[in-house]
Amino acid sequence: MPNVLSDDEELLNGLGSEIMKPSRQGNHMARTVKRWVNKERATTADLKNVNIDGVHGPVNTESYISPGQLYSTDSGNLFHAGRILVVLVGLPATSKTLLSVAITRYTRWLGVRTKSFHFSEYKESAKNIPSDYFCVVPTSKEGVAFVEKLRMQMLNDILAFFNDLSGQLAIYDALNIRKIDRKNLETTFSEIGVKVLFIESIVSDQEIMNRNIALALESNDYKGLSTDEAIDEYMRRLSVNEPYYEMMTHDEELSYIKYINLGKQIIVKDNIHGYLVNKIVFFLMNLRQKKGCVYFARCGTSDKDNYIHDEELNEEGIHYSQVLKDFVLQRIKQKRQAKKNSDSLVEVIDGSHDEDLKTSLIVWTGPRKRTHDTALFFSKEGIKVQQRSELRQLNPGSIADLTDQQIMDKFPSEYKESLKDPYHFRFPRAESYHDLAVRMEPLLLEMEHTSKDILIIAHESTLRVLYGYLMACTCVELPNLNFTRDKLVEISFSPFCNTVELLNIPLTS
Amino acid sequence: MTTSFYDLECKDKKGESFKFDQLKGKVVLIVNVASKCGFTPQYKELEELYKKYQDKGFVILGFPCNQFGKQEPGSDEQITEFCQLNYGVTFPIMKKIDVNGSNADSVYNYLKSQKAGLLGFKGIKWNFEKFLVDSNGKVVQRFSSLTKPSSLDQEIQSLLSK
């Protein structure tokens, strides 16, 4: 029986090395600090208590650690990247808010302390709003003062985020259409060592334009107006700002990305460098407008629910598969019909792009028989089913198929440690949730890339990770999420946040 | 009453009749224009398109309209002078009209009935909305104010080659 080293002993001797005498000098292999700083105690999180994602939640908890985070540092900065300000550039309704929220979700998932600062939110909470506040150069004295005040508030909050809250990535969401505004931002933040990256969003595709304008008209800016009146008002605002729009060019000597027609084309200026910045670029290359939903379902049952054997479905499992297929297809049809009949212009536009289910729904399963066989009824309907190796369940290693009591008996010290940090703990020859999250990242990017409805049939462990990303959960919440067989989880997308709905699968019929 | 594009008629800037049957066999772009609009700089690109394809059978007609934000307040003479002086416009500018409402010009009533615009609405939403008509008199495309004239180059080229 090999000795089990404590954390401190392992750190002193270095991972994988022979045990050395404590008195030995100059051990350069040893890590000088623990891998995780300030772990937080686990608490239970129930799916039903939350139906809006946490992407706008605060990041100022000292002990905050993200699901996909590889390591932590005292300063909070990761990837040797220092601090970064992302500045969005573009006219109204060019998906700037969508971009800022998506980048926030993804980078937070990686562990970067990210926060978006939306001009529209500052305007919402202001008083005595002048009528020309939406102009980049307001005509009235009150308008000029108002816009300047909001800009100063935003700048001060961003500086506080960097300096007081150990923020690493701030996203500035406003028009920023003039060269002088961009130059000022670059100058202000360069002086304090913050790298500035501009992302210009351009929409010239009529279909995307229609949808974006419809979304914009649903904001508070246009409350009380009929749709016709709202469009006129929108065009008036656009008309006022259009003459001031200076598209980004090489001459400005700034780092920028042009994101055109929601990712159909991306132009990256050649002076962009740095691991984290390039990770953002890669993410943008995969980001697309979402029209469908993502659905999560467990697989059907087998006789022994055993990990070691790759079991087939039993009778109950086959029945579940049939019911699941009928329920999912019915739900998607229902939802699309509701879109066509909706009062919301966005929904009507989305509904008008309705397609045959065979081509607009895709089903992903894990590589194991139970998950794939649960999707057989979808295959019979002509719907594409793909086995994804990334959806392989968390590998339990030495504790495979053991009960909690058996784990306690056989691995008492490991069991105790696992309760302290269920997300990161790894049993012998097993994976941790963290390992699972890291290996699933390519799948997350692929989800961002598709605009179809997606149904994912998988083990609970993988569903937790996927849900955790889409709903911006913390790594404390993630291991405690519950996915039961009687529930279909539906996640809907909008530019500002994702929402979840739990649907009862009618298994008793 | 069934109307074809070529049955339409309007007044030119001098108040004289402009019959659309003279447009047969030509590709036509029709734009409601204004002198004090954020999109007014689109005149430059419209003129570039006109110069590039005029010899191949392409025509642009500009219809001044003061219905959106009071951005075309001048007289017909002032409008013509503005276009020529500021943008070197050589394509025809018609007499000022309404494009929406009970006084809407018959040309625009026809165009709006053929193609819906932004968000599916028939009404013209702002200055510099554009209709593209092929050489058979069919309204094939409608573009919002946001669409830059330079991005229409490909469409025009393919219609001219038919």
Swiss-Prot record, chain A:
Homodimer. Induction: Expression is under the control of the RFX1 transcription factor. Present with 3380 molecules/cell in log phase SD medium. GO terms for molecular function: 6-phosphofructo-2-kinase activity; ATP binding; fructose-2,6-bisphosphate 2-phosphatase activity. Beta-D-fructose 6-phosphate binds at residue 237. It catalyses: beta-D-fructose 2,6-bisphosphate + H2O = beta-D-fructose 6-phosphate + phosphate; beta-D-fructose 6-phosphate + ATP = beta-D-fructose 2,6-bisphosphate + ADP + H(+). It is found in: Cytoplasm. In the C-terminal section; belongs to the phosphoglycerate mutase family. Its main location: cytoplasm. Beta-D-fructose 2,6-bisphosphate binds at residues 298, 433, 464. Its EC number is 2.7.1.105, 3.1.3.46. The record marks 298, 459 as: Transition state stabilizer. SMART domains: PGAM. Keywords: ATP-binding, Cytoplasm, Hydrolase, Kinase, Multifunctional enzyme, Nucleotide-binding, Phosphoprotein, Transferase. This is Putative 6-phosphofructo-2-kinase/fructose-2,6-bisphosphatase YLR345W. ATP binds at residues 90-98, 212-217, 415-418, 460-464. Synthesis and degradation of fructose 2,6-bisphosphate. One of its GO terms (cellular component) is cytosol. It comes from Saccharomyces cerevisiae (strain ATCC 204508 / S288c) (Baker's yeast). Residues 292-466 are annotated as: Fructose-2,6-bisphosphatase. The modification Phosphoserine is found at residue 6. The active site is at residue 173. The keyword Transit peptide does not apply.
Swiss-Prot record, chain B:
Its EC number is 1.11.1.24. Keywords: Antioxidant, Cytoplasm, Disulfide bond, Membrane, Mitochondrion, Mitochondrion inner membrane, Mitochondrion outer membrane, Nucleus, Oxidoreductase, Peroxidase, Redox-active center. Signal peptide: none annotated. Changing residue 37 to A: Prevents oxidation of the protein. GO terms for molecular function: glutathione peroxidase activity; phospholipid-hydroperoxide glutathione peroxidase activity; thioredoxin-dependent peroxiredoxin activity. CDD domains: GSH_Peroxidase (cd00340). The keyword Oxidoreductase applies. Disulfide bonds join 37-83. Induction: By oxidative stress, dependent on transcription factor YAP1. By oleic acid. It is found in: Cytoplasm; Nucleus; Mitochondrion outer membrane; Mitochondrion inner membrane. One of its GO terms (biological process) is cellular response to oxidative stress. The active site is at residue 37. InterPro entries: Glutathione_peroxidase, GPX_AS, GPX_CS, Thioredoxin-like_sf. It catalyses: a hydroperoxide + [thioredoxin]-dithiol = an alcohol + [thioredoxin]-disulfide + H2O. One of its GO terms (cellular component) is mitochondrial inner membrane. It is a peripheral membrane protein. Present with 2010 molecules/cell in log phase SD medium. The active site is a conserved redox-active cysteine residue, the peroxidatic cysteine (C(P)), which makes the nucleophilic attack on the peroxide substrate. The peroxide oxidizes the C(P)-SH to cysteine sulfenic acid (C(P)-SOH), which then reacts with another cysteine residue, the resolving cysteine (C(R)), to form a disulfide bridge. The disulfide is subsequently reduced by an appropriate electron donor to complete the catalytic cycle. In this atypical 2-Cys peroxiredoxin, C(R) is present in the same subunit to form an intramolecular disulfide. Monomer. Belongs to the glutathione peroxidase family. This is Glutathione peroxidase-like peroxiredoxin 2. The gene is GPX2.
